[in-house]
């Protein structure tokens, strides 16, 4: 199954900076399994949330600075369309902060490549 356009694959690292909220969509595919994310929000605290179709799957414990790991169970609906296998990762910088730098990596379910 091909991923939808403008959607990143899993096993991808995303980097950014600036202010406000950054949303990136990732295709995890139809195979269920545990998904692990690593992140580095550096000095300026950021909040990271992962959503599937508007439902929160995982999040950092508020605004955090530094390295961390988070994970969630991926249980996609069987027989879905490619959009059913997409999650949205939302990174929000500290409100009022002029800039922030961060990166994260999101793995594939069950550690597959």
Where do the language-model regions lie?
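Non-cytosolic beta-sheet module surface loops
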Residues: 39-42, 93
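Short strand-edge motifs at loop-to-beta-strand transitions and within beta-strands
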Residues: 23-25, 68-72
